[in-house]
């Protein structure tokens, strides 16, 4: 029987485990780090006792052994309060953290205002102080300078989402063409004769790509197309739909780039006296609990942002540790359409 662990308010260490078990710290260290020189029975005793006392590896010590900081960086050029209400980014960030922590890395998150230059300032500070081993990039622009800056700084990075540019870095690409086709085919099949597309800022490459795809697909399906821009916020989505000319077709469907924009579209439709789904349809490019509980509930694309973030975090760690080749690319699965009350036949 294992001796009872000594009660202590301090963090369990290799030395305290060795004292509890009556063996040397070196033996405990070899067992915990899966190194040779320890018998199977002893290794099992050490692992079981470590679990009992709640021992976890010290991230700082691990980083020193690896010659790295042990940190992954993520900079969001957004208002923190706005991000806190944005389910997509919360899910992506949780996915990144899930992957990086599984490899023993800490995720450092910074919020900055003022655009790309302020974000690059953070990257330079991190590189100068050796605070991070790599960076996850989100929301790339068509003429994004961040990859070149990170290359010059010697920081590994992974790109999440659509990007138009060199492909010699690791990335997780989204299935924008397939998702756009799913949306247009759905609204066309239900008798809507036009798409009012409300995108986020067109500085983002993925928003420009979605706009290009929907314009082409609407033309191919004989549907009218109109476009408005918004921020990823309910009030902005509401303003975008209210200022749109909704008479560009007889029965439009709003295609919103986020669930918050979609909720804003619901409010605008009510203010305009348009019945959803009878007179106006609504589809969100992002699914969430918000889309599910809205009234009426919102048809949406289930894109699994948590899995996307986890894939990106894992890919970056593998790049840092030399097990992912330069230019390695992962592709997210096409989204699954979740039909709800905001779209229906007339």
State where each predicted segment sits.
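Hinge/beta->alpha junction and helix N-cap segments in small-molecule ligand-binding domains
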Residues: 79-91, 109-118, 172-182, 198-242, ...
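Short, well-structured alpha-helical segments in soluble
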Residues: 118-131, 237-248
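Amphipathic helical "hinge" segments at domain boundaries
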Residues: 55-121
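Short beta-strand segments enriched in small/hydrophobic residues
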Residues: 27, 68-81, 186, 194-200
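N-terminal helix-turn-helix DNA-binding module of bacterial transcription factors
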Residues: 1-70
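Flexible loop/turn connectors
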Residues: 225, 246-346
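Flexible loop/hinge segments that line or gate small-molecule binding clefts
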Residues: 138-181, 260, 286-298
């Amino acid at each position: 029987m294992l001796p009872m662990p000594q009660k202590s308010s301090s963090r369990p260490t290799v030395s305290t485990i060795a004292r509890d078990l009556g063996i040397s710290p070196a033996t405990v260290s070899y067992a915990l780090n899966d190194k040779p020189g320890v018998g199977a029975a002893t290794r099992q005793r050490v692992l079981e006792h470590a679990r009992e006392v709640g021992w976890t590896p010290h991230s700082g010590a691990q980083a020193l052994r690896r010659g790295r900081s042990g940190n992954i960086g993520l900079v969001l050029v957004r208002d923190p309060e706005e991000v806190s209400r944005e389910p997509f980014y919360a899910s992506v960030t949780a996915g990144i953290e899930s992957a990086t922590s599984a490899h023993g890395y800490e995720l450092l998150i910074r919020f900055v205002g003022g655009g790309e230059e302020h974000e690059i300032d953070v990257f330079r500070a991190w590189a100068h102080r050796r605070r991070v081993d790599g960076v996850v990039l989100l929301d790339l622009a068509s003429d994004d300078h961040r990859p070149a800056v990170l290359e010059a700084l010697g920081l590994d990075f992974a790109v999440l989402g659509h990007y138009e540019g060199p492909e010699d870095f690791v990335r997780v690409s989204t299935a924008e063409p397939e998702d756009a086709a799913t949306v247009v085919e759905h609204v066309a099949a239900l008798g809507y004769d036009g798409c009012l597309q409300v995108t986020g800022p067109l500085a983002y490459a993925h928003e420009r790509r979605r706009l290009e795809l929907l314009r082409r697909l609407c033309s191919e399906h004989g549907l009218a197309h109109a476009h408005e821009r918004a921020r990823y916020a309910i009030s902005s989505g509401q303003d975008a739909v209210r200022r749109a000319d909704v008479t560009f077709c007889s029965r439009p469907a709003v295609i919103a780039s986020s669930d918050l924009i979609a909720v804003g579209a619901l409010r605008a439709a009510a203010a305009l006296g348009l019945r959803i789904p009878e007179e106006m349809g609504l589809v969100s490019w992002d699914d969430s609990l918000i889309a599910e509980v809205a009234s009426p509930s919102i048809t949406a694309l289930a894109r699994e942002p948590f899995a996307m973030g986890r894939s990106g975090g894992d890919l970056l760690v593998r790049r840092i540790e030399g097990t992912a080749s330069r230019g390695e690319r992962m592709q997210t699965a096409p989204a699954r359409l979740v039909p709800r009350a905001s779209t229906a036949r007339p």
